[in-house]
């Protein structure tokens, strides 16, 4: 079965480099990612754009818009990009210039969507500062991907990353599709309700375990941990709106795919691992066709 990994990273972020070395034990490079893709029948990935101007500064308030995948000079052919947004630069005298650069980037064929780092940046997703970004998403028919749940930085504020904030946003912006990252973990039941209630809200299952095989074995063999997520999936009962992602380099792709296969009932595997990505990200069809 072909797989589309809709949530990976390929940015020069210090914490990602350290995680790859110390925890997940992966080769954090385009070549390393491609090798894992080939080994696991992953035909396409979507990278979440993010940058830091100073080593260790993520989430960096000084990063210009849009934030991209800067570990390599250009986006590899087997990837697409969700352009990252720094809301701190969307106000003031230079806001229009920032928005103009975002819009120009959205016209690139390798761009699949927009990424908001809620919690990392201290703005609610329904804050008016993001309104022009949602207007661009509607104009170019791309989804907005939103970090929710625990932040991979002590400088994040969790109140901005709670999945219930997406409920108000989805109501305000019915013309835009949104994806809740990480199923809102640890607030997975809240995220499940937001997905079930709102026709324009999806969720990914990325980033729920970080580390190498011993980490995965520990958690996959803990019923309380697995049932934490299964309960939310069963409650939502919208497997057509759940998408596979790994959050690589936070975990090896083979281990993460095994984990999600255990979480999701087998009859829904093809939807979650492959088909649902086409529904949420309209541009991936052309990207895959271009790969031949």
Region roles according to the model:
Residues 7, 37, 68, 114, ...:
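Conserved, mostly hydrophobic/aromatic
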Residues 11-28, 53-55, 151-153, 213-218:
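Acidic/histidine-rich helix-loop elements
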Residues 27-37, 91-105, 188:
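Short, acidic/polar
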Residues 59-160:
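Active-site gating/metal-coordination segments in enzymes
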Residues 109-113, 126-243, 291:
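Catalytic pocket-lining loop regions of alpha/beta-barrel enzymes
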